[in-house]
Amino acid sequence: MKLKRLAALLLCAAVMLPLAACAKKPDSGTSRTSQTTDDTTVTPTKDGDTSITATDKGNKGAAAQDLMQGITKGKGASKKPDSRFANVAASFALDLFKDEYKSGKNTLISPLSVLTALAMTQNGAEGKTLSEMQKVLGGLDRDTLNAYMNAYLAELTGKDSALKCANSLWIDSRLDVKTSFLQKNADFYSAQAYKADFTRKNTVNEINSWVNKNTNGMIKKLVDEFDPLTVMVLMNALCLEAEWSDPYTDNCVSEGTFKNAKGNLVKAEYMYSQETEYIETENATGFVKYYKGDRFAFVALLPNEGTSIDSYIASLTGKGFLGALNSRKNTRVNTQMPKFKCEYSNSLVDTLKKMGMSTAFDGNRANFSSMATLKNENIYISDVIHKTFIEVAEKGTRAGAVTAVIAAKSAAMPVEQPKEVRHTRPFVYAIIDTRTNLPLFIGAQTDI
């Protein structure tokens, strides 16, 4: 059987994940009764659910239409993050970071953005596709993960928080989307859903505008164009703009040199300070610097002399990362850290396959039957793209991430000498949530 390629995309200003579809045998033709409004058709399905189909009605030039009009956001189950969730999320974060890191290259990911996008996507998965996704995401069943994420995202993005999060689904009129899929993503992730024609330039502009707006301009756009076979895009965007609790002053900044991963010396602007939390492990030292409000903090980890950045990153584990932060000491530490900016973009398909999530990318075997249906086509993930941005400077930090899933058819301190941590060579850094110590962003700076 000749298959038509159906592309799917996931974008995350931290990550992007695409869905796609391929041809399948027609079903038995069971009759269904539909109810149609001006913009959508609600149809009972064989499994007792309903599906929503966006209708064109001559609106090719109009703005994307809201598909959540008939869906009221409910109060989804909520489970306060605990040590079980922290261990699962930390393991996912560090495994993703290790597999994504390329030797000697600046790398930046947002595990939270990727986790959110994949958690939304797995609400539409079944069978082996679902079991593989659950394993990669830490082994929690999807209801438990939804409950944890519901509570965690609410905590992180509460009133006056420096972190903002937004989720949206963009759906082609060819797709019959399960109402239960939309409902779950509304209840647990406050996701919005819109009808979109991916062949229109206006749709590209609207989606890029959504990305730009929800990352405060840190990530300007997701794509230049979509494959004409695209049928859905699921997106998560994160934006953090935080000021240091103790900003660097002008007299604490001076020029110097940074020895990059290739051994070359390059010019850098360094920020100097004395911090009060010191990290020491068997192969690295580091410090913690807080942002205003103390909910978020910056962590910088420098491999010991004689330990390469590559071997240090290869040794990282979720358990070890949490352990290092949980055992940090209240000790004065003199720090030297370069100002830096990093923009990162990459496909996560190979990384996620390596982690054990392969069926979701297989046009013949993927099962997203709880997400949507498309006549004679099978939906699968065709790509996952991750986009991130960070800027660390005297006043604070700006960081952004966006994840999109695109579906298409295929078809009190002791008196002692201060410690010293000088980040004048490649290092690992993270922005953490100080209540769980989980990394919201994690990266490796190998060059300036």
What spans do the regions from the language model cover?
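Short glycine-rich loop/turn motifs
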Residues: 93, 283-286, 387, 425-429
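Extracytoplasmic/secreted cell-surface and envelope-processing proteins
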Residues: 127-133, 307-310, 344-346, 400-401, ...
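Short Gly/aromatic-enriched secondary-structure transition segments
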Residues: 133-137, 248-255, 310-318
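Feature captures eukaryotic membrane-trafficking machinery centered on endolysosomal pathways
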Residues: 106-130, 288-290, 416-448
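Non-catalytic, conformational "gating/processing" segments within enzyme and secreted inhibitor domains
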Residues: 51-63, 104, 144-304, 326-414
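Internal alpha/beta scaffold segment
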Residues: 303-329
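Non-catalytic interaction/Regulatory regions outside core domains
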Residues: 16, 58-72, 375-378, 384-389, ...
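Detector for small/aliphatic-rich hydrophobic stretches
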Residues: 2-198
